[in-house]
């Protein structure tokens, strides 16, 4: 038997309704913030991620699914969404459209070769937003408010917003030099990844899963001590907006994002449930990127965004015992008796469905009792039984499956009857 690839999952019908509910809710929220959907290819040129995500990142070095196509071009299944959205922004000259900043959101599968664990998959579904064209602390605050709005709209309460400023390019340069001086004397005691990052991306040493508990990491210089006046002022204004919005947050000077393109504001949304088993910690992450567009040969524009995993959102809802208001019923199940009724039901079903009425019937020639059980299993709100007598008299009984009550109506009025019920 051929089995599903490791690190992937089948989303079965009983779960896909939850996914559709979440995706519909996210679409509705995006309209409130005036964000428009964008869809990019599942695969892109490998160079896009090497340049846009960063050669020194774990994503590029260890986790990408890369292959050569028949034209000998290096192609990669997208490991994240931002680089592709920015590529599309540049290629389609969106900086020239009248509505600025350009507010975009996306939702789709991403691919990373990661170790299988709860809440993490090698194919996962990422929802994200990107606001490009405005370097304004109020935009950063809006994006952070949107993050909180999303999770709170699903009923999650045990949330902790963690923020930091990585500063501008000048601040980061000075800070990276300080980190190199700090870690060089002890780098031999660190893992191979940290050793390779010391002179390429020393900030990543701070969030190394292997060495983050070392004293040298705990006592490392803090980015807040190296922010220039402009970076400090920007971050302070972001925090002022958050205070005005009543959004609680925690500052963590060691918070750095795993991708190279972040500047200024960086953030993560964490689980903060005392009963949580620790299987996942971070629900969502993002930040500002002020140099990414130029890095990809685009205009001198700034952006900010975030991404979240639908799988992790579902896991968080499960851990907090939150049931989604998923509609799993349909309007009508037709029970048939005899060949004439079976033939008539095919025509009737077609009329019902074309009129917007969710309806179904038996296809396995069950007896009436078995058909009624099937209607109950399918959560049909109503059933009708059609046999020779009903066809001859053109009268049927509509049964309410929740109350057991019946109502007798003209068979030819069945479509109108349910249209009126649905209005």
Curated annotation (Swiss-Prot):
Top-rank EC class of the record's enzyme: ligase
Annotated compartments: Cytoplasm
Pfam families reported for this sequence: HGTP_anticodon, tRNA-synt_His
Protein name as it appears in the record: Histidine--tRNA ligase
Gene Ontology molecular function: ATP binding; catalytic activity, acting on a protein; histidine-tRNA ligase activity; transferase activity
Ranges annotated as spanning the membrane: none
Domain of life from the UniProt record: Bacteria
Record field: catalytic activity: tRNA(His) + L-histidine + ATP = L-histidyl-tRNA(His) + AMP + diphosphate + H(+)
One GO CC term on file: cytoplasm
Underlying gene: hisS
NCBIfam families: hisS
EC number in record: 6.1.1.21
InterPro entries cross-referenced by the UniProt entry: aa-tRNA-synth_II, aa-tRNA-synth_II/BPL/LPL, Anticodon-bd, Anticodon-bd_dom_sf, His-tRNA-ligase, HisRS-like_core, HisRS/HisZ, HisRS_anticodon
Family named by the database record: Belongs to the class-II aminoacyl-tRNA synthetase family.
Alphabetic keyword roster: Aminoacyl-tRNA synthetase, ATP-binding, Cytoplasm, Ligase, Nucleotide-binding, Protein biosynthesis
UniProt-listed HAMAP family: His_tRNA_synth
PROSITE patterns: AA_TRNA_LIGASE_II
GO-annotated biological processes: histidyl-tRNA aminoacylation
Subunit structure: Homodimer.
